[in-house]
Every structure is written in C-alpha cells, then in structure tokens.
Amino acid sequence: MKKYLFIILLALVSLSGQAKKPKQLVILHTNDTHSAIFPINPQLPDTMKADRGGFLRRIAMLKEERQRHPDLLYFDSGDFWQGSAYFTMFKGEVEIGLMNQMGLDATTIGNHEFDFGLENMAKMFKKANFPILCTNYDFTGTVMEGITKPWIIIKRNGVKIGVFAVCPKMVGLVSDKNCKGVKYMDPGKVALETATMLKEQKKCDMVICISHLGWNSNRGEDDQYMIQNSRNIDLVLGGHTHTYMPVMEYWNNMDGKPVSVDQNGKSAVFVGKMIVNLK
C-alpha cells in the first residue's frame, strides 16, 4: 500500500476564536481494478505485481484499515469491470456484489463500464449499495437516467467534503451502440462549475474530484486539462491510464495553485492511502 501525508490549508474557523486541533482524514483510493477477483498470477515475472491485488484481498485489507481508522474514506475511480472471465460470464454482477462489501464512499464510470451497453450498466448499477458519480455525462432519455449522481457531500470527522466525478470522452473508447443517447460535457468546464458550487454555495471544507480522464493522456482532455481549467479542487483521485504514482503528482489549477493527484496502476496491486491534515 502506498502512503502519503499532505496538508491542506482550509479556513476552518472557530466561532469561539479558540484554537482547535487539526482535523485529519484518511483516504484510500483504487482505480482500474478490472475484474481482478483473485490476486495476480504468483508466477508473473514482474515481482512487483505477482500475487498482489484482487477484490477478495481488498475486502480483508479494508476491514483491517477500518479497525485502525474507523472514519476512513474509500473511493474508486472506475473501470472496475472487464479483464477476467467473471465479467464475461456474469457481466459485472460479481464485481458489484464484492464492492458492496467494501464500504465504498463513491466510485465513477470508466469506459469499460459501457462494455455490455447501457441496459446492462443500468441493471447492475441498481444493485450497488454505494454512490456512482458522474458529473459530465448527461444520461437524460436513456435507461441510465437518474441512476448516477453528479456530486455528493460527505461529513466525516467534523469535515464537510464535496465529491464529484469526471469521465472520459466516449469517442474512440466506447462503441457507439453502447453509449447511444449519452451526452458528453467538457470536464474542465464541468469541474470548474461543480467545484465552485461545492466550495462557495455548499460551503464544503474540501473538494475531491474522482477522475477517469487519465494522466498525460494522448486524448487531450486529461487530468491536467481538467485541473488547469478549474479551481476549488483540493484532491484528484485519478484513473484510466493505469499510471503508477509512487508519490503524488501535482498540477497547477487556473489560479496557479498546485492540486494533488493520485493514481495507482491497475488491478489494485497498490492502494493509495492519503493522510490529510486540515488546518
């Protein structure tokens, strides 16, 4: 498990004027777990990946982490489907069933969630006991209408956290028949509007963007594009490009302020663990 410690300076003002102890959040993050129900082949030549990951092992790890940090947050950045015979045979039901045991605070939609079409996506997503966020797809008029949420607010350890999600352009990634009627919206514009609303109108102390845009993607509208065209985002939990970040990356927003970004390769070989101190 990777581990980061970073400090976010936010205006958590005490009305009494008395100094308060810093608030702390523990955040776990996975991305692109790709139906890896069991750990990766132990005979794999790449010893960094061999016999690691897997949905079942992650359930056990999360239970252990919650014993140490009962208030932890856990987010996933999409593409939890596609990559094993379990998905081919059961079309996502196995993955959703196991994710229901993980206490997910939210996930989002990756391009592979479209692989069996909107009807299957709607059917399986209705079985989820966790929020599935997507802010820049408009599902109006499709079977997916009303199933996802554009954003949520979580209150944890005295901190008000706004969470939203941005997903990739479907052209070139998703078959036209599998996303018919879905409208894609510019992630930079949507991120700016949503993060500003969460910070200024909803008065969130922290704003997290769950992203499946990718890091250094050759498609243009990636995490860097989204960050530099927005403000009010404190943390980006990324996915899609299977980028392994041994340390957090940073990219400046439209005001020149660095935004923290995490991504963890694929198959939950690594789980990002962030300890956030809010002053």
Regions found by a protein language model. Name each.
Residues 1-2, 182:
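Intrinsically disordered, low-complexity segments enriched in small/polar residues
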Residues 2-8:
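Sec-dependent signal peptide recognition
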Residues 8-9, 64:
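A periodicity- and composition-biased signal for non-globular, repetitive helical segments
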Residues 9-17:
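Hydrophobic h-region of N-terminal signal peptides that target proteins for export
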Residues 19-279:
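Acidic, metal/ion-coordinating pockets
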